[in-house]
Amino acid sequence: MARQEQRVSSERVGIFSSLVYPDYRRLWGATACSQAAVWALVVLRGALVYELTKSNVWVGLVTMAAQLPSLVVTPFAGFLADRCERRHLLAFTYGLNLGINLLLAVLVLTKQASEWPILVLAMFNGIIRSVEMPTNQALLPNLVPRERLLNAVALNQLMQQGARVFGPLCLLPIIRFVNPETAFVLSAVLYAIGWVQILMIRTASHGTIVAQQGILGNLVAGIRYIYTQPLMRSLMLLTLCHCALTMAYESAFPFVARTQLGLRAAKDLFEGPAYLMIGLGAGAVLGNLALARVGDQQRRGHLFLCLGVLSGLTPILLGWTTTLPWAMLAAAAVGASTSAFMTLSQGIIQTLAPDGIRGRVMSANTWHTQGAMGGFNAVNGLLMDVPWMTVPLLFGGTGMLFAVIMLGSVLMVHLRALYARGLPPEALAR
């Protein structure tokens, strides 16, 4: 009877039910601003570097520079997220990124920007983001009751992914009616607004650091936990493949705009990728809004498998579009499937991770996902400069490979149980 009541209650979760908690609402707003700033920079940096160098490789390198630092930084970031007061650490990262974005805007506006300074600043952005992301993920579960955690994660993912609409959408009028250089100021303004929101959070949040383990032992605690838990290990490897094969598309958007959509004018170089990013973000918003209403664990397990397969198939559709409206619709399908898949994955990992080491577990998660996306953005940049490479071949090959991996994952016992029944009750009861 109690289980039936719990199931009915979970199915009645409202889409925005977690926003009734003030500190979560502040974190949600700050996440919206920081992510919008990040996606605006992704569009602007890629277009500017291609304008300066006419090289897809450089676009891939700059995109990688913003993501690959997570391979080195995130283990230390997880340690910091469990050692320090999480809200204070998060505020510190927002302040640093605000300063870096202001510096980049000044360089661009004064015509001093070249590919090397842009790459170095992108790397510093990535280092700080590698601390910001696991700290955000470790703080979030302390701001809502456990029964609202999956809803809160879905809403947080809604903003993280849906900011791809807000950030590039704000860029378009500045690019069209002023100039692309002025648009760089937007990222700094958005980070400033987010920083104020973080400073208003009042809930204290700490992890647990074991003194006897030493710094190294505490650093690897999150990775050790993931790879000694069969379900976590399988889930992490699947998510790594997903990020590498279906989500490393940022460096490809200038290439898609030029070769597939025929957008070759000077401002089109900035506007084309912005429109594609808006399509992705719109799909991500719809996907996460739909997912936020799904409280039943069994349905979530079924959706996880279906969304994984769709994450591989939708990029194939995007690869064959030749007009901007259809490309935006296909990008929306990619955004809906990939972001909803990542929301479910992150929610499962956050639920399974003990509170005392959640920061280190989430940093290990970021380490895997950002490292995969950063590395494969660089690989895609190299591939796009190969004379015979086309968008259908690039997106079709990687997308089909992940769809096959996803279907093959049903052979793994722990994942098959997750697809069939969702998370086990003992995980939800902790």
Each PLM stretch: what is its role?
Residues 9-68, 224-280:
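Helix-loop boundary and gating motifs at the non-cytosolic
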Residues 32, 114-131, 326-340:
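Hydrophobic core of transmembrane alpha-helices in multi-pass small-molecule transporters
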Residues 41, 50, 103-107, 125, ...:
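MFS-fold secondary transporters
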Residues 60-62, 72-76, 83, 87-96, ...:
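C-terminal transmembrane bundle of multi-pass solute transporters/carriers
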Residues 115-126, 151-207, 249, 271-282, ...:
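Hydrophobic alpha-helical transmembrane segments
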